[in-house]
Amino acid sequence: MAQAIFEALEGMDNQTVLAVQSLLDGQGAVPDPTGQSVNAPPAIQPLDDEDVFLCGKCKKQFNSLPAFMTHKREQCQGNAPALATVSLATNSIYPPSAAPTAVQQAPTPANRQISTYITVPPSPLIQTLVQGNILVSDDVLMSAMSAFTSLDQPMPQGPPPVQSSLNMHSVPSYLTQPPPPPPPPPPLPPPPPPQPPPPPPQSLGPPGRPNPGGNGVVEVYSAAAPLAGSGTVEIQALGMQPYPPLEVPNQCVEPPVYPTPTVYSPGKQGFKPKGPNPAAPMTSATGGTVATFDSPATLKTRRAKGARGLPEAAGKPKAQKLKCSYCDKSFTKNFDLQQHIRSHTGEKPFQCIACGRAFAQKSNVKKHMQTHKVWPPGHSGGTVSRNSVTVQVMALNPSRQEDEESTGLGQPLPGAPQPQALSTAGEEEGDKPESKQVVLIDSSYLCQFCPSKFSTYFQLKSHMTQHKNEQVYKCVVKSCAQTFPKLDTFLEHIKSHQEELSYRCHLCGKDFPSLYDLGVHQYSHSLLPQHSPKKDNAVYKCVKCVNKYSTPEALEHHLQTATHNFPCPHCQKVFPCERYLRRHLPTHGSGGRFKCQVCKKFFRREHYLKLHAHIHSGEKPYKCSVCESAFNRKDKLKRHMLIHEPFKKYKCPFSTHTGCSKEFNRPDKLKAHILSHSGMKLHKCALCSKSFSRRAHLAEHQRAHTGNYKFRCAGCAKGFSRHKYLKDHRCRLGPQKDKDLQTRRPPQRRAAPRSCGSGGRKVLTPLPDPLGLEELKDTGAGLVPEAVPGKPPFAEPDAVLSIVVGGAVGAETELVVPGHAEGLGSNLALAELQAGAEGPCAMLAVPVYIQASE
């Protein structure tokens, strides 16, 4: 196969001959009709800037093929230190051709121009791969000679050639005007019949670089020498003649053997071993080694990574790495470096003209300008539907449905209807209602710029991004409320207010009269950014609607645009913000879609219905970890846990005015207590003239009229409206209390002191035995007054009158009222009576029945 090359160039040494023979036999790049070969897919690789021809002995590399062949003729020295390269430029492309000969010659261009060589610095390509992407030097030499011998051959006209799998360095060239063609060479013998050609090769080129003319690169092929055609080749600047055969000493220098394949890394100027040898050589059926090549995608990625690391070979200066003086980061552009340095210094050279806020990047100023845009004044209202409350008539008799629809009662209410609109239709006409009215609540969110409606606020907020162009720039001056749709007119208007404007630092809050003074001040925060004042998390609240804002400017804009007037369309209530109105609207509706099957209540969400179901089941899954209380709802447990806190956070706000020192653990208790200071008692009892400030207190009072108490004493059957009152109740009639009374009796009888005569001598007279339980009941029963006609008799005593007998002159009676820990009207405690009394004393419990006067 290589005989044609050996006959054309007889001056090659044995090393070159062995390399060429092993290449042609092993890689199977050229079809051999006499031997078996393995067809490897053509490797597509990006092209470097120039072709490189490497000498096998002295390792010199050349960019020009004639200069390389001249070097081979002059018997190069292996120890030459200098490496010279010559550049080869082309101005056309190779036409495709193919032939089934032993050696396939590369197609030649119609016109070729070779420039003079230049000297470049030594290239890192002094070593080549054994089985990698870059071939050994002798392989490059073989391909170069094959291309050189094909320069004098005519241009064929035939099918596309088979691209050699040899990975040669090619140079892209731009098409220029071709010179006039030279005279045709002598005819050559015709080639043998061609074989079916494989698919044509794809265009080669570096990633991202266009190839003019489709294939404007110098490509080296192994093609047949004798080809028919009329193409001519003209070589300028170098007169090239056939070289005579050279005698080379029969010495073969074995190339170095690498244990593992190496990959050339252009960026690091060196070689590095591969990993687990991904490109291991394959063994053919004949026992030869077939070189394997990386996939085109792998080659393209590798070339792209190392394209910037070949400054010597490409002839371009290497980009200088700009290193940050504060850290170890490097940048290729000065612009990126300067922006990075600002992160260390805190410098912010770009200021907003409207508010003076400084930024490190100009793009951030443009983003910040969007914060000065507001919605137009006419579209800053609420998102509540105008017909949020509607009344729909539902017919109980389907035959009368058409008549009810004709009345128009199902239409939305035009104004603010009265609460009477909820009354069932047909009740006034007869006892049986034939239709009923259902109040429907529209809780959707309405867009102010289009008729779209959304079920949640987040959907509306996402939709409003489509109307961003509706926003306008508003003047920052308080007295000027002008708006501008364009930024240019807004900035021109701001300049007219420069004498009136004051600028506030967003870091420390200081005000400055001019934009320049603010900019100078902001550099003080940039000197030591790590010690700059921390941005306070101050929250600015609106006193009317309790909305929170992060800046005073935002709060001021809210006060200027918000109406704080949101009336309910169904009643006369007015709310300061929209969310309060939305929370109030469901109170007019049917309650929701989810109905409880036990109590027939409606709920807006299924989750609320599930929580409500615990009330009917009696299940209390939420238990207190401190006490034994259990609750059927989690919020009730959370509210209950407040009573276990050691400090009461909610204090009466009128303590400085009225001296009220009451404190509470729960906010709802404080709210109820505040109403007691107003003096307004709107809840009146229908059975008596009492009135209460809370509805719950009225309900407790009404149980006293009906006798339906929640809590009753087991001993005396007295009823209480609260558990606290039952706990404080001192029952004298219960069996346990009677046992305690018997155990506390004195062991001996004592006589009551009695003064006799004027001497004041005390005489002890025996007291009767303490009244037993049955006697006390009989005594109490005898004191029950007669029932007044027309009024129910008293069922139980309202109080117990404790009478202290003997011992103390100043002792008075004590009236014990249920619910009060201390007695009423007693100026001495029982312990003081027992300690200060000279004689014995006894306590008599007398039931007292109190009847209110007419």
UniProtKB/Swiss-Prot annotation:
Cellular-component GO terms for this entry: nucleus
Pfam family, one: zf-C2H2_6
Subcellular location(s) per record: Nucleus
TM stretches of this protein: none
Cross-referenced InterPro entries: Znf_C2H2_sf, Znf_C2H2_type
Zinc finger (C2H2-type): 53-76, 322-344, 350-372, 445-467, 473-497, 503-525, 540-564, 566-588, 594-616, 622-644, 650-677, 683-705
Residue segments, region Disordered: 152-217, 399-434, 731-763
Alphabetized UniProt keyword annotations: Disease variant, DNA-binding, Metal-binding, Nucleus, Repeat, Transcription, Transcription regulation, Zinc, Zinc-finger
Primary role: Transcriptional activator of STAT3 involved in the regulation of immune homeostasis. Also able to activate STAT1 transcription.
Disease implication from the record: Hyper-IgE syndrome 3, autosomal recessive, with recurrent infections: An immunologic disorder characterized by skin bacterial infections in particular with Staphylococcus aureus, susceptibility to fungal infections such as chronic mucocutaneous candidiasis, atopic dermatitis, recurrent respiratory infections, bronchiectasis, and increased serum IgE and IgG. Immunologic work-up shows impaired differentiation of CD4+ T cells into T-helper 17 cells, decreased memory B cells, and often decreased NK cells.
Protein name per its UniProtKB record: Zinc finger protein 341
Organism field: Homo sapiens (Human)
Source species taxonomy: Eukaryota, Metazoa, Chordata, Craniata, Vertebrata
Gene designation per UniProt: ZNF341
